[in-house]
Amino acid sequence: MENKESVLLELVPKIKAYIKDDTVKEKSYQDFIEKNKELFICNLYNVNMITDEDIKLLYITIEQNIDIDDKSLVAIFSYIGYNFEKNIHDDNSSIDLGDRMTGDMNYNMYDTFFSTLDFIIRQKHVNILVNDEGNNDFNINYRSFTTSLSYKEDKYEQVVNEIPFNMKELLSYVSKNLDQLRFSKKYLDFAYLCRNIGIKISKRKYNVRYIFNYVIDELTIPIVIKDYLDVKYVYLEETNKAYRNNFDNDNKYFYEWGKVIIPKFKNPRLYSYFFLSNYGLCDLFMELINIKQVTFEPRKNPIEYIYVSELKFWEEGGSVDFVPCEHEIAIIDAKKVSLEYYENINKFIAKYIYYEDGLAYCNLCGINIQELNLDATDVTKISLINVTYNKSIFMSEPYNYFSHSQRFIFNTIMSFDTIMKSQMWNMKYNINRLILNFLIDINSKRHEYEKQFATEIKKGIFFLRLSANLFDIQMSSMELFYSAKILNIHFIVALVIVLNSGADFIMYYMTNKKEETNYSDLNHIISVIVFDFLKKTRTVDSKQFNTIELFTETYMKIATEELIVHYNRIKLEMERLIAIKKDRKTPNYDISIYRQIQRTDEIAFFPSCITSTKLFITYEKVVAENTEIITIKHPVRIKEGTDEDKEIFEDIMKKTTKVLIRVNDTNAYNASFFTTHIKLEVEKKKIIIPLTSLFVYNVLKYYSSNVDFYVFKFGDPFPFHYDLISQEHTNHKITGYNMLRQELLPNSNVFTYFSDSLNRQELEFSFYMFLASYVNVTEWIEENSKKIKELYIINFNN
């Protein structure tokens, strides 16, 4: 490929020959191009080297300076602006493809604005070269200039520095000092002497069109400059505002400019993409496309009645039920008082909740759950849900104000462990947090409690005021109500420690006392343990047990919600331990289910994703009368099974199938099957599940890579063993088969099975023959494999 210099060496002689040709009467650039069309062929292969504008400029230059030598012309047109343009090109080419595409889009948008609107340069200092033939120095001397005030308006001054410069021998000067021009930054401001207005250049700016107003003797001369000008401010006359000249993607002035530029577009719809893809312009899209508002003319004769032909089934009525989101049902189970209360809450949050600006939203339906908002539950500050046992709580508010409480409370916990033979030290931070929460709650409602428990106050109750020296054991013994404060704060600390313990510790301690204990009266048991501890630490004497019992009854009435949860947890644990202690015979797994679970009468085939439009289901859907003719068809006769059918069925069932069993979203291992129950290992813990419970609620989830498994085990709560468990098991499988049939073969008969046999293979082969009466079973399974898996997982693995 030829370079730019070689192309110019070919062009210059042709232009000179054309201009000197006397046979041509009317000489012009267009006529020259007509006679030298081959120049465009050359230009086609050298697009980046020389353009049509370059040829035109070269023609005008030669026409005005016919005697200039060829080498000088080639030198000037080969290198003027070359260095700067090369730097710009290299800088742009180094950008990543994605950034370059974004940059091109951004440039085109700004180029549209600057090319259509007249953005006037607002530069405080502008240098202008003024012709001075008496000046023999061809260098640009910034020191020798005269200053003139170009204009002053809108509190803005523009100072023009007129620099004398001899332009008579400009071309010869440029050709001789080409190297100096290429490496001198002061010529860069004047585009290497291509213009006489000097404004700084920046590669960070775009090559867009600007207007420079040059004022001479009250005459304003607008000069158009298109270059990478480093202009800080531009002025737009239509808005009478000055704008900072930055080329951000999200320019806040786009909206103002857009309202000005829309009337100037000849075909506004061509710019729809610009307006829709920009945040600042998208609001102007309707104004851009100029959609006229629909107007309605009033009728001359207004209609008094509108007659509507109603369908008959409209009279029957209809009902629309709101299907609750899955999280509304799950949160009820998660908030039930149980041994795994906090674990259930945290699992619920991990599965259904995402936080945005401290607000809790369901990731299925998008509804805000206010009780789980960070500001509502104070999860971050108090860890009401995410309980941490081994992390200091005094790094956050409000606990950092009570960091001095650690010494008193931690000493009490160590004393409790030593005296009562417990292990509460590992939960010291949680105990400290619960104590502070309780005291903060009492402090906020102290005046209300003083009126409510006036009788109890006379007997020793003292509602503490939260202060800086509350836990200071060195506080003056002369302080009012000193003994009452000491007794109440020691009791609260001991009470919270006991509530953080487990039922095994409480029952072990009460058993060692060798006294008859009524475990249904938990308040009395707590009073006994707290009294024994306070008596051994010499906080109370042996005659104050009734006082401690009064304290227990009173403080449990005003306990925080979390302490009440611990209280109920201990009651459940004690009931469970007592039940286990009584039941030393062979366990009956059929009656050991203590959780009541509602059983649905019918399973609906819902889609795998939930959207707001699908949360409404209309029932009692009736087909409009006279819409189509219903043809009554006779039932299809079910084929009788042959030896060949049995072989095909056995080949299908012989496929190696590995089944994954999951319990509560956790993989189960080492499954052992017995006549009445199943033994599984989940996270290194062995669990026992009675077989009859599988028909009550869906505990076990089955996963397989073989679609045949999902077809013939569809709706089967226990898809193992050669024999079914009971007649109820048979009914479950028949119901599941009909669900599958209704979804994938809606025009088929209802599947029935009248045998009393519990043989699994007979029932599954009967369903195979039922399917074979309508379709080729193998091909049908392959075609509907995705739908079958989806139906199985939605209905039985959710």
Curated annotation (Swiss-Prot):
Induction: Expressed in the late phase of the viral replicative cycle.
A GO term from the CC aspect: virion component
Entry keyword annotation includes Glycosyltransferase: no
Cystines in this chain: none
Biological processes, Gene Ontology terms: DNA-templated transcription termination
Pfam families in UniProt: Pox_Rap94
Taxonomic superkingdom: Viruses
Keyword check for Cell membrane: no
Keywords: Late protein, Transcription, Transcription regulation, Transcription termination, Virion
GO molecular function: DNA-binding transcription factor activity
Subcellular localization, as worded in the UniProt entry: Virion
Region (Interaction with J3): 234-254
Region described as Interaction with NPH-I: spans on this chain: 1-195
Assembly and oligomerization: Part of the early transcription complex composed of ETF, RAP94, and the DNA-directed RNA polymerase. Interacts (via N-terminus) with NPH-I. Interacts with J3. Interacts with ETF heterodimer.
Membership in a protein family: Belongs to the poxviridae protein RAP94 family.
Domain notes: Interacts with ETF via its N-terminus and with DNA-directed RNA polymerase via its C-terminus.
Chain's role: DNA-directed RNA polymerase-associated factor required for the transcription of viral early genes as well as for transcription termination. Within minutes after virus entry, recruits the core RNA polymerase, the early transcription factor (ETF) and other enzymes needed for transcription initiation, elongation, and termination thereby allowing synthesis of early mRNAs which are extruded through pores in the core particle. Recruits the multifunctional J3 protein, with poly(A) polymerase-stimulatory, cap nucleoside-2'-O-methyltransferase, and transcription elongation activities.
Name by which UniProt lists this protein: RNA polymerase-associated transcription-specificity factor RAP94
Classification lineage: Viruses, Varidnaviria, Bamfordvirae, Nucleocytoviricota, Pokkesviricetes
Name of the gene: RAP94
